[in-house]
Design a protein with these regions (language model features):
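A short coil-to-beta-strand element that immediately follows conserved catalytic motifs
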Residues: 61-69
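A generic structural micro-feature
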Residues: 2-4, 32, 76-82, 101
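Nudix hydrolase/Nudix homology domain
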Residues: 31, 99-136
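Active-site-adjacent beta-strand/loop module that shapes the phosphate/pyrophosphate-binding cleft
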Residues: 71-94
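Conserved Nudix-box catalytic region and its N-terminal flanking loop in Nudix hydrolases
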Residues: 14-56
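Short loop segments at secondary-structure junctions
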Residues: 15-17, 24, 89-94, 109-111
Length: 136
């Protein structure tokens, strides 16, 4: 049976840096660096789901959310992901990681390009994300 999954992620800014989190060894995509976020639960409001995922993965509260872009990808013949990527801001740089992640960095523009995987960088390029972010 075909499956559609809605994933939400956020580029979180604090002091002109972007939060990247590194996946744990047990998780799919192990050791990959990513921006925080995850799946929307049935019946959940979009921003409530985004806030929940960010709190679960980082312990942070965010504000000023703005939808930057949407994308879709077939990850298998029977599974499609719809992804929403937001921009938001953190009040603090004190991150508390969940078991899904093992490290984090408040990244500069150079670190973003070095650490993010190619599909995410391609999405950022397609939507001119690095051009609109006010980061060092």
């Amino acid at each position: 049976m075909a499956e559609l999954w809605l994933a939400q992620k956020s580029i979180i800014l604090y002091n002109r840096k972007v939060l990247l989190i590194q996946r744990s060894n047990y998780a799919s995509g192990e050791n990959d660096w990513e921006i925080p976020g995850g799946g929307l639960r049935f019946g959940e409001d979009l921003l409530e789901g985004l806030h929940r995922e960010i709190r679960e993965e980082t312990g942070l509260s965010v504000y000023g959310e703005k939808l930057l872009y949407a994308m879709t990808a077939l990850v298998s013949p029977q599974r499609q992901i719809v992804g929403l990527t937001y921009l938001s801001y953190a009040d603090s740089d004190e991150v508390t990681l969940s078991h899904e992640h093992k490290d984090y960095v408040w990244a500069s523009r150079k670190q973003l390009v070095e650490l993010l995987n190619k599909p995410m960088l391609d999405d950022f390029e397609k939507h001119s994300i690095l051009d609109i972010l006010d980061i060092d």
